[in-house]
Amino acid sequence: MFGLKRNAVIRTQLYCGGAGLGAGSGGASSSGGRLLASGREATTRREGGGGEAGAVIGGSAGASPPTTLAPDARRVARPSPIGAEGPNVSATPPRLLLLAPPCRASPPEEMEGPAADAIMSPEEELDGYEPEPLGKRPAVLPLLELVGEASSGPGMDGSLPSTPPPAEEEEDELYRQSLEIISRYLREQATGAKDAKPLGGSRAASRKALETLQRVGDGVQRNHETAFQGMLRKLDIKNEDDVKSLSRVIVHVFSDGVTNWGRIVTLISFGAFVAKHLKSINQESCIEPLAESITDVLVRTKRDWLVKQRGWDGFVEFFHVEDLEGGIRNVLLAFAGVAGVGAGLAYLIR
């Protein structure tokens, strides 16, 4: 009777999923063997996804072939309940383990290339963007560029635009002082009479600059009268449009990049020579536009140089030596007249 009970226990273990005793333990059973068989069965089920359990139960552990991992071996499935012969139908669908480190998902294949590169966050789009400072933008286009565009355009003669100056120019002290001095000098040369109206701004500095310009400019006109006449005939100035076209000549004077007070005073002196011509042909109304053209090109294109030279104060200081020589000449002439030296000394100091 004891043998019958033992056989019943063995059959019960086989039915409930226990280890095969005939092959694995040589016909003997113990609590340690059952635990070992149960652990081996659970390991086999986990590695095989629950589908290899029947093969292990039906045969011996040594006779079963080695388990081959399927391509989806990384899929995790719940182990089957004890006594179940197949996988648990109540288990959730297996999920694929994501072993990649957490990072931003890469774009799909069809978006690789320029489309994928275009995907940017708002922070990336604004990174490195710096608005252009307003103070660095020029208030007006340099006059030299305007002259170049006008001269290269179809049907244009290189004349300056007749638009009024902006507010920045009206408040420009260097431009205002230059226009006042040049305009006064050209009018006085054309009419041959002194203007009694006082100069604005810094009256002492402007008056000194005007006196220096009159002295030096008159000498330039006397020394280069023949050259000025040839230039005037070539330009054939008759009206205001011709006066504005002088800007091309003025720009050409400084085209080689050399700037000095000698060139500047020669330019203004030629303007005074043209002003006399305009007076002779009853075109006095063109004298003011002529002064504006000279001032525009001079101040707009040579502003940095003029500022470094201290403007009209530097102009007066530069020709101060010439003024000293003029004073010495006057003293010598007076002495020669008193002493009766004669015309020989006057010729030498001329």
UniProtKB/Swiss-Prot annotation:
Family recorded in the similarity comment: Belongs to the Bcl-2 family.
Name of the protein in question: Induced myeloid leukemia cell differentiation protein Mcl-1 homolog
GO biological process terms held by the UniProt record: cell differentiation; extrinsic apoptotic signaling pathway in absence of ligand; intrinsic apoptotic signaling pathway in response to DNA damage; mitochondrial fusion; positive regulation of neuron apoptotic process; release of cytochrome c from mitochondria
Entry keyword annotation includes Nucleus: yes
Organism lineage: Eukaryota, Metazoa, Chordata, Craniata, Vertebrata
Site (Cleavage): D127, G128, D157, G158
Region (Disordered): 23-95, 150-169
Recorded name of the encoding gene: MCL1
Subunit structure: Interacts with HIF3A (via C-terminus domain). Interacts with BOK, BIK, BAX, BAK1, and TPT1. Interacts with unphosphorylated BAD. Interacts with BMF, BBC3 and PMAIP1. Interacts with BOP. Interacts with BCL2L11; may sequester BCL2L11 to prevent its pro-apoptotic activity. Interacts with GIMAP5 and HSPA8/HSC70; the interaction between HSPA8 and MCL1 is impaired in the absence of GIMAP5.
Composition bias, Gly residues: 50-61
Span of the annotated motif BH2: 304-319
Motif (BH3) on chain: 209-223
TM spans (from-to): 327-349
SUPFAM superfamilies assigned to the protein according to its UniProt record, in alphabetical order: Bcl-2 inhibitors of programmed cell death (SSF56854)
Residues modified as Phosphothreonine: T163
UniProt tissue specificity: Detected in peripheral blood mononuclear cells and bone marrow.
Single GO MF annotation: protein heterodimerization activity
